[in-house]
Swiss-Prot record:
Disulfide bonds: none annotated. IRBP shuttles 11-cis and all trans retinoids between the retinol isomerase in the pigment epithelium and the visual pigments in the photoreceptor cells of the retina. This is Retinol-binding protein 3. One of its GO terms (molecular function) is retinal binding.
Amino acid sequence: SHLFQPSLVLDMAKVLLDNYXFP
């Protein structure tokens, strides 16, 4: 089963930040 891994969270956060393009 897939567990909620910190690495996955960080990767998703990076993508979200890149998409939203926060200053």
